[in-house]
Amino acid sequence: QDTTEDMGPTGILPGTHNWEHISDPDASQTAEDDLSLCGKAGTVTLLHFDAWHRAMANTSTHKRYMLKFQFARMQWPPQPTWQHERDDWQLSQSANPVESHVWNWLCGRTGLNSASEPAETALSNLGTGSERARLDAAYTLGAQEKDMLPTLLGHLRREAREVEKRIENKTPDNAHGTNPTALRAAQAIEAIGPDCTPALLEELNDPHWLVRASLCDVIGLWGPAAGDAVSQLTTLLGDTHWWVRRNAVEGLGRLGDVAGQALPEMVNTLKDKDRRVRRAGALAIAQLAQQGKSLSNAIPSLMTVLSDEDRYNRFYAHLALSRMEDETAKAALIDALFTARWCPLTTNEDLY
């Protein structure tokens, strides 16, 4: 259907997908300019999952319908997948280390080209600056290379202690408790690049769960270049904190084929008591199950997740099975399809 602004389209705050805070989460008090996602029938809008967004008021006489699809990257980008003419990010009017880092990552490169401000200034901003200053500082420090790692690890430990109570709660930037914003010090470490992997492996035993979880996330973002971390990430699948287990199995899925040696332990996460760990486990196995590869040992547990209480978990289990060239997996998918044909909403009061 054609969607106009008075029909209550989705409203977004452009450029806020890396922001932990905005002026005010109350839409009536928000100072940032929003953008209404309007368009003719058939229009498709691609939106970063973490961008601040909300449903706008429908003041028209029409109902507004929407189809929402969630996309997840299944492998680390080894090279540009578009017509690529420039090596460096040059489209922004001002120096922006965050944009440069994302550009390099999409091009299959790690690290930043150069620091945009002195390290002393960036270190000060990392702890006490404004939201934008802290974000820029993280990626500026990431351009300082490995010499900055010990200092950044110290910042990470302090930041973990400071935000621990808030970050476990449902907050405006993490309304469902499943997608917390990364710590700024962790973003700085990730920007340095995978040459830090050996040093980080020694830090995965840190006594603070948020430090362990953050470093698992960092290693996973480095992709196959951090393949030496398989053993340590596998050990952390038995961690006492759900967030560490979740990030550890997610990281294994991102490391590529080398993580296949951890498949039995990854399969065990499909039985985890926390739905968020099960979700990450199903997605990680789906990432390993490239077309033409069978992970037959995972099939029985994936079949169990097909009836998981969480709809996303069910989807990722379907996805993992669909990526396997295996007759048992195919049969499980067909059985699930026929089961889905039964309507669970039919009652004596609503027969049809």
Kindly give the residue locations of the regions a language model identified.
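Catalytic core of non-heme Fe(II) oxygenases with the double-stranded beta-helix
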Residues: Q1-S36
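Non-heme Fe(II)/2-oxoglutarate
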Residues: W52-S124, A133-L135, Y139-L141, E145, ...
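Glycine-rich, charged/polar anion/phosphate-binding loops
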Residues: A31-D33, A51-R54
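Terminal, low-structured helical/coil segments at or just beyond the last alpha-helical repeat
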Residues: A331-Y352
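Conserved metal-binding segment of the jelly-roll/cupin
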Residues: G39-W52
